[in-house]
């Protein structure tokens, strides 16, 4: 039996790279170096390591831009910051030795979740984009909880600054 033809989900167009000049001036960015240990034998960034870099950028964003310790929320407040979904579009491979710029934008803030748009740029070319849905949970009950007010306020202020 032949495999069914794969199509994009209804309502989802093929993603195209965005030039960084269209990112908001106040958007938070960080630089990550692609190291030997991040790559497959061909010297191309291994996809799971790309996801690790995205998570590292989010952790850094919390402290550097929101002034809220990611690890404090998890360790001290017992608030989980789990990913409900991560939808990544890869436009070009990332190679060993390259410096990648990760830009984080807030698309939407809900009651229990926030949607991030994370853009990875090499020089002036977007090579990857990830739409990341993060849900706040109680690490005691493992159920979704309302985003804590200080976090929601910080996310809202950042989102507003990027308009």
Where are these regions (language model features)?
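Short glycine/proline-enriched turns and hinge-like loops at secondary-structure junctions
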Residues: 44-45, 112-114
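Short hydrophobic alpha-helix segments
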Residues: 130-132, 148
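Hot-dog-fold acyl-thioester-processing enzymes
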Residues: 2-84, 139-163
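Hydrophobic beta-strand-centered segment that forms part of the acyl-chain substrate-binding groove
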Residues: 62-113, 128, 135
């Amino acid at each position: 039996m032949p495999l069914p033809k794969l199509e994009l989900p209804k309502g989802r167009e093929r993603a195209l790279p965005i030039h960084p000049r269209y990112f908001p001036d106040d958007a938070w960015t960080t630089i990550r170096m692609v190291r030997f240990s991040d790559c497959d034998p061909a010297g191309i960034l291994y996809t799971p390591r790309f996801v690790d870099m995205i998570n590292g950028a989010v952790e850094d964003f919390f402290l550097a831009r929101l002034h809220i310790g990611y690890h404090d929320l998890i360790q001290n407040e017992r608030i989980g910051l789990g990913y409900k979904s991560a939808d990544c579009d890869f436009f070009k491979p990332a190679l060993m030795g390259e410096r990648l710029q990760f830009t984080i934008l807030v698309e939407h803030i809900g009651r229990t979740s926030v949607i991030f748009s994370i853009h990875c740029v090499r020089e002036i070319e977007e090579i990857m984009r990830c739409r990341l849905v993060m849900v706040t949970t109680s690490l005691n009950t493992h159920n979704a909880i309302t985003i804590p007010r200080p976090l929601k306020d910080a996310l809202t202020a950042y989102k507003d600054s990027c308009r």
